[in-house]
Amino acid sequence: MEIRDVETVNRINLHSHIAGLGCDGDEVEYDKDGLVGQIKARKAMAVIRKMVESNKGGKVVLIKGDRGSGKTALAIGLSKSLGGVHFNSISGTEIYSLEMSKSEAITQALRKSVGLRIKESVKVIEGEVVSLSGRRIVLKTVDMESSFEIGEKMRGELDKEKVSAGDVIRIVRERGRVYKIGTSMVKRSDVVGTDTRFVPCPEGELIRITEETQEISLHDIDVVNSKAEGYLALFSGETGEIRAETRDEVNKKVWGWINEGKAEIVRGVLFIDEVHMLDIESFAFLNKAVEEDFCPVILVSTNKGECIVRGTDEPSPYGIPRDFIDRALIISMEKHCRRDLEAILRHRILEEDILIDDDAVDRLVSISEASGLRYSMNLLTISSMRASRRNGRVALGDVERAFELFLDEARGTESFNG
C-alpha cells in the first residue's frame, strides 16, 4: 500500500505582518510597519494613539471606507503601536447571544478595555540559599545571614522551583510565592550546562519592602467578585450575566484604591468592527456608556454608506444613528491605487515566504483592482499550494488556474443569475 504525505496549510493571519502605524514622530512613511499608503488616515490615528497614551477615554472614533481599504489593518496598527495597553476587538454581530443581553455583552467588552494598575508595597526576603532542610531555610546576603522557618505550602513552592543551596531566590511571604532569580556566581565552576543564569549574591538586608505593580482589567475584577468561584470563570470564559450590584461594589473599591493612591485607571481601546450591525438599542447604550468615568476610547469601523439603522425605519449615514455620529471623530480611508495594492501583496508574499514570478504578481495586482484585495490574497494562497506540488515558484499559469476555479463576487453573482 502506498503511503502519501498529506499537504497541510499553515494559516497566517491576514494582518500578521502589521507591526505599528509606521509613524516616526509626526512623519508618516509611505510603507512602514506593514501599512501602505493611507497617509492622512495614519496621521489621524497617530493623534488617537497620543490620546490613549495620555489616558483620555470617553471618545468615539469612526473609521469609514470601502471593503478592502484597510480599516481593520489601521486598527491593528494602533493596537501594535500601543504595546501593552488594553485593546479589545469585537464584531458588531458578537453582541447578539442567547446567553446574555446586548447591554451585558457591550458592558463586558467595555470593561475588558479598561485596566486597573495596582501599586502594592510587599515585604520580600531575598538572598542566597545557604542550606535547606525540613522546615528551615538559611539565607544570606553579602552583609548578613539568617534562618527562617517555612510551612508546608512554602516548602512545596521551593520544591517546585527546584531550589537548592547556592540559588538566589526571592520569597513573597504574603502571597506564598517563591521566585528563583538564578544561581550564585560563586557556584559557576560547579555547575555544568549553559542554561543556568548566574547572578551576584544580594547586598544589604535580607528582608526589605519593595513596590510591585500589576495590571488587571475591570472585567476580570467583576468576574472574580461575581460568585464564590468567580476566578474559575476567568479560565473557562463562561462568565454569564454579572449583576449590576457587583459592578457597583467593584467600582466603589476601585475608587477607594484610586483615592488612597494604591491604583490608577488605564483606559484602553474597544474596537467594534462592522458597527452598522448594531441596533438602535445598542447605540443608545453606547451613547450613555461614553459619558461614564471608566469608558475607554471606542473605535468603530464600517463600509456602509447611507442605510437603515437596525431596529428602525430611518436611513442614516453609515447605518449609525445621527446622535452617535455627532460624538465621533471620523477617519476616512482612501481607495488603494495600483502601487498600494502591489506593495500590500508584496508584504503578504514575504510574510508567507512564497516564491513568485513578477508576471504572476502583476496579474494578482490587476485582479485586486477589479475584485478586491481579499480575493487576490486567497488566490495567492491557492496558487502557492498548486506550485508547491512541483516544488516550484508561483507562475502566471498557477494564478490563472486558481482564477478559473474560484469565482470572485461579480462572476459568482453572474453565474447564479444565469
Swiss-Prot record:
Q: What catalytic reaction does the record list? A: ATP + H2O = ADP + phosphate + H(+)
Q: Which GO terms describe its biological process?
A: chromatin organization; DNA repair; rRNA processing
GO molecular function annotation: ATP binding; ATP hydrolysis activity; ATP-dependent activity, acting on DNA; helicase activity
Q: Which EC class is the enzyme in?
A: hydrolase
Among InterPro entries, the record links this protein to: AAA+_ATPase (IPR003593), NA-bd_OB-fold (IPR012340), P-loop_NTPase (IPR027417), RuvB-like (IPR027238), RuvB-like_C (IPR041048), RuvBL1/2_DNA/RNA_bd_dom (IPR042487), TIP49_P-loop (IPR010339)
SUPFAM superfamilies hit by this protein: Nucleic acid-binding proteins, P-loop containing nucleoside triphosphate hydrolases
Q: Name the keywords, alphabetized.
A: Activator, ATP-binding, Chromatin regulator, DNA damage, DNA repair, Helicase, Hydrolase, Nucleotide-binding, Nucleus, rRNA processing, Transcription, Transcription regulation
Major location category of this protein: nucleus
GO CC annotation: nucleus
Please give the function described in this protein's UniProt entry. Answer: DNA helicase which participates in several chromatin remodeling complexes, including the SWR1 and the INO80 complexes. The SWR1 complex mediates the ATP-dependent exchange of histone H2A for the H2A variant HZT1 leading to transcriptional regulation of selected genes by chromatin remodeling. The INO80 complex remodels chromatin by shifting nucleosomes and is involved in DNA repair. Also involved in pre-rRNA processing.
- PANTHER family to which the protein is assigned, alphabetical: RUVB-RELATED REPTIN AND PONTIN (PTHR11093)
Into which family does the record put it?
A: Belongs to the RuvB family.
What name is this protein filed under?
Answer: RuvB-like helicase 2
Species, as recorded: Encephalitozoon cuniculi (strain GB-M1) (Microsporidian parasite)
Q: What is the lineage of its organism?
A: Eukaryota, Fungi, Fungi incertae sedis, Microsporidia, Unikaryonidae
